[in-house]
Amino acid sequence: MLEIENFSLSYGEGEPVLQDITLSLKAGECLVVTGESGSGKSSLIHAINGLAFHYNQGVGKGHIRFEGESIETLPIYRIALQIASVFQNPKTHFFNVNTTLELLFYMENMGLDRAKMDRRMEDLLKIFPIEHLLGRNIFALSGGEKQILSVASCYLAGCKLIVMDEPSSNLDEASIAVLKKMLPMLKERGIALLIAEHRLHYLTELMDRLIFLETGKIARAFSREEFLSLSEDVLADMGLRSREKPVLHVSAWKNEGELTVETLCCPFRRGEELKLSQVSFSFGKIYGIVGENGCGKSTLLRAMTGLETPKKSRITLRGKPLSGRERISRSALVMQDVNSQLFTDSVEEELLLAWKGRCLREKTDGKIREKAAEEAAQREIETLLQALGLAECKERHPMSLSGGQKQRLALATCLLKDANFFYFDEPTSGMDRKNMLRIATLLKQQQREDRILFVVSHDTAFLQEVATECLDLETFRKRTAGARN
């Protein structure tokens, strides 16, 4: 079905992002592709679905064929009829506001009649328990719900191959269980799967083979049996996540401290409200915020920072009320979709921009001591780049980075800010073990007596490393009259 022989991929005059790739994939097979962030996983997927050639001006050497035809020369609409894609950022999939219309949109573009569309929808709902997502506003979905909708759309397209780029990166364990249940059913229907992934625990029973990419090359290849025989120490040396499902063991939330949410009421999706009362947080701690997809975690962060106006709120610091404006000025936030937080033409410029924002507040006698400040900033920026493994990327455009590299860059810009309250929304989504541990180390270094850090995450292994206490937001989600069951 898919044949790749001695294939290399380059963009412009830069170094190849893929080198001498040779692999094959048959109908009903599952190939897992893993490796450090920036190792070429997304580039391989973009080569297979044709985006590297048709949209990114990539230049290929060697052969990449699907059912005997060269993907480089096939029109993009022909590729789309055979190969479906699930991207790291599910927002790039959507063309409609309504979720049901979005699912139908794929089939409408293929020219299917109404009866065939109905049959496919019925078949979909037998595989995917996603009735609760139908008829919803896409913009009201959580990141994980959007990803599930993307996978469902790919199934409806009726393609022979589905390529997935970090499909579990924003999913909670319940949503991963849905994905884990659905993928074998796709295999049974003869659909081939190529999955680029860091979380491996839910794929061990599904995979037929696994390849490990390193700097754009296939460094190692394993059958399922060979991969399962590797020790945890070997996996750690390779920078891979554990095969075992992680379990969170951190202290429960103690509800004490200087920052208090005396009352907070936020409508966050159809018929539901997030309600907190007398919830306190202490300086010098890192709070993990957990809960299933769609329970209001991102809404809580936006309300806490002052970016979202709740229906009702009173937040105090040592007993004194903090207005929304005050919270904005004292907060730094890394959002789930970091693409909306990157503005400049290079990694280094992005960090300098964050530093200049801090300088607006750091004045001496009404003036900024520019030379000394710039030298200090350059040292701080270099330290951050080294700590996050981005030193070699400092001249690159932020939009050319991998998803994990963008996450680390956004986190670095956040840490350069002069803030008391730091909020991180899924900071390790789509991130390998090595870089996850880098971020955990860096966040623990930020624990100071004048700072509180909040981390929303489904990454249990990361929370195990970094969180001092955890708040389960499921406790505070309240359904109003008429809410869906």
Model-identified regions with their sequence ranges:
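ABC ATPase C-loop
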Residues: 154-155, 415
